[in-house]
A protein has these predicted regions:
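Bacterial signal peptide processing site
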Residues: 19-23
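Post-signal peptide N-terminal segment of mature Sec-exported envelope proteins
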Residues: 28-50, 65, 69-70
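Extracytoplasmic/secreted proteins, especially bacterial periplasmic and envelope-associated proteins
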Residues: 39, 43, 67, 78, ...
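The canonical Cys-X-X-Cys-His
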Residues: 44-54, 107, 111
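Gly/Gly-Pro-rich "capping" loops immediately C-terminal to redox-active cysteine motifs
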Residues: 53-81
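Axial heme c-ligation environment in periplasmic c-type cytochrome domains
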Residues: 61, 82-114
Length: 114
């Protein structure tokens, strides 16, 4: 008599493999990867892209709304403070030493999908 558990286990394993996926690769940016504003694009490409395009050093990827959500909940003043003073892997001034608060606000808005 055929053991019923073997075919059921096989079906379960096939479904498990078929439904699994790399969650990181599934979270693709939802918007453009370069700002429409040329001056913001220049700042982004020079100072932000190297970390935020790839998610280097736990930086939230540009356009990854899910990764940005808990940061945005802290509010713009906290995000600006972290950007200006540095926070965890984020270097002070985000390596944009000629940026001002308005520039950082625009960059954060773009990268967070806002």
């Amino acid at each position: 008599m055929l053991n019923i558990r073997t075919p059921l286990l096989l079906i379960f394993l096939v479904l498990l493999v078929a439904c699994s996926g790399d969650s990181e690769s599934m979270r693709q940016p939802s918007g453009p990867t370069t700002p429409a504003d040329a001056s913001v694009a220049e700042l982004y490409n020079r100072s932000c892209r190297s970390c935020h395009a790839q998610g280097a050093g736990w930086a939230p990827k540009t356009g990854d709304i899910q990764a940005w959500a808990p940061r945005l909940q802290k509010g713009t003043p906290v995000l600006l403070e972290h950007t200006i003073n540095g926070f965890k892997g984020m270097p002070p001034m985000g390596m944009c030493f000629d940026c001002n608060k308005e520039d950082f606000t625009k960059l954060i808005s773009f990268m967070s999908g806002g």
